[in-house]
């Protein structure tokens, strides 16, 4: 893990694919290696690594958690904003608001969401429940083969989630997922193979 050079918040790793989807095209030449995402609301830094820092003004995408005015995107896959959630919560309650808006139900987060993750962390920060999920008991690393683009990554991520895994990290050659203790790990391999790629398991 690395800490943001401006606010010292611990960042989480994001793929070059994610960074490239949100940073302005003129800055693509600076995208080298993995970056880290800073989630602190008041910090202007979005992505950073040892060599490069990208701030809000250098992105073409609004980073909802860092915006002070609407629209404040929360679920990028289903185009759900903070305002939409709050309005639905006022009428139907927070739990129903998540269901009605479809927040947290997307499958392309690694590309659409600047954080490179599902928006569940953002929903929880706003006080919305993301219940119904089982707590993961173990973390598993999956070696991947045959992926060549962000479309491949998104397809494998969706397949793993359909198999019941919580995808923590994913790239062209590996994925790290969390699953229940009783989960059949071979089903994860089968899910990747069903999406048209090769995989093998390595417990962490």
Swiss-Prot record:
Binds 1 [2Fe-2S] cluster per subunit. GO terms for cellular component: cytoplasm. Changing residue 118 to S: No effect on iron-sulfur binding. [2Fe-2S] cluster binds at residues 75, 77, 109, 119. GO terms for molecular function: 4 iron, 4 sulfur cluster binding; metal ion binding. Changing residue 75 to S: Alters iron-sulfur binding. Residues 138-200 form the HMA domain. It comes from the Archaea. Gene3D superfamilies: 2.20.25.270, 3.30.70.100, BFD-like [2Fe-2S]-binding domain. Chaperone that serves for the intracellular sequestration and transport of Cu(+). Delivers Cu(+) directly to the transmembrane transport sites of copper-exporting P-type ATPase A (CopA). Probably has a redox function due to the presence of a 2Fe-2S cluster and could reduce Cu(2+) to Cu(+). Its cofactor is [2Fe-2S] cluster. Cu cation binds at residues 149, 152. This is Copper chaperone CopZ. Keywords: 4Fe-4S, Chaperone, Copper, Cytoplasm, Iron, Iron-sulfur, Metal-binding, Zinc. Zn(2+) binds at residues 4, 7, 38, 43. The keyword Acyltransferase does not apply. It comes from Archaeoglobus fulgidus (strain ATCC 49558 / DSM 4304 / JCM 9628 / NBRC 100126 / VC-16). It is found in: Cytoplasm. Homodimer or homooligomer in the presence of copper ions. Monomer in the absence of copper. Interacts with CopA probably in its Cu(+)-bound form.
């Amino acid at each position: 893990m690395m800490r943001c050079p401006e606010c010292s918040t611990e960042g989480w790793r994001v793929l070059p694919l994610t960074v490239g989807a949100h940073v302005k095209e003129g800055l693509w030449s600076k995208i080298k290696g993995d970056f880290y995402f800073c989630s602190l609301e008041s910090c202007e830094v979005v992505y950073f690594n040892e060599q490069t820092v990208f701030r809000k003004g250098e992105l073409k995408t609004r980073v909802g958690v860092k915006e002070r005015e609407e629209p404040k995107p929360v679920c990028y896959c289903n185009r759900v904003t903070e305002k939409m959630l709050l309005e639905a919560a006022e009428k139907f309650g927070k739990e129903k608001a998540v269901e009605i808006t479809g927040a947290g139900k997307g499958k392309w987060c690694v590309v659409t969401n600047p954080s490179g993750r599902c928006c569940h962390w953002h929903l929880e920060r706003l006080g919305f429940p993301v219940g119904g999920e089982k707590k993961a008991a173990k973390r598993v690393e999956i070696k991947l083969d045959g992926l060549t683009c962000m479309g491949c990554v998104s397809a494998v991520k969706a397949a793993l989630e359909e198999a019941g895994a919580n995808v923590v990290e994913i790239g062209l050659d590996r994925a790290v997922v969390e699953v229940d203790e009783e989960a059949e790990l071979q089903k994860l391999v089968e899910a990747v193979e069903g999406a048209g790629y090769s995989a093998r398991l390595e417990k962490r």
